[in-house]
Amino acid sequence: MKTKQDFPSINERKADGVREDGTPYRVLIVDDSMFVTKQISQILTSEGFDVVGIATNGEEGLNKYKELFPNVDIVTMDITMPKMDGVTALEKIIEFDKEARIIMISALGKQDLVKKSLMLGAKNYIVKPLDRQKVLERILMSLQQ
């Protein structure tokens, strides 16, 4: 029978967003919905990730990525945004940095754009509404690729 000592306390457990050396993974969030950016930010920071930037459209996301490069480990990118959509921003970021890890965020019914994004180099995708566990799983999977 397992006792309390067999389970790490919340303070002893390594946060998912922290590397073995203790440094956090750095995330850029690109989404035009303040609700979504706040939700992703809360999920990730609670697990030790460092949100290094937030952008509200693809053009701003591209510029922020270039400004922060190479200090971004992963990007979450909404597909449908003003000024520059997420697919175009993905394409331009991949042109700039072939090693970029980008996860697309999509509403239901955007499967054609999700497929196109994956073909262009996105590492994974998340479908809205966001689920905490799925967000963490997809990000951690993409970081290991």
Enumerate the predicted regions with their spans:
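Two-component/phosphorelay signaling modules centered on CheY-like receiver
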Residues: 34-53
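Acidic catalytic/metal-coordinating carboxylates
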Residues: 57-60, 85-88
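Non-catalytic signal-transmission and effector/linker regions of two-component phosphorelay proteins
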Residues: 1-26, 133-145
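Receiver (REC) domain active-site loop signature in two-component systems and cognate sites
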Residues: 81
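Active-site beta3 strand of CheY-like receiver
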Residues: 69-76
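A Lys-centered signature of the CheY-like receiver
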Residues: 128
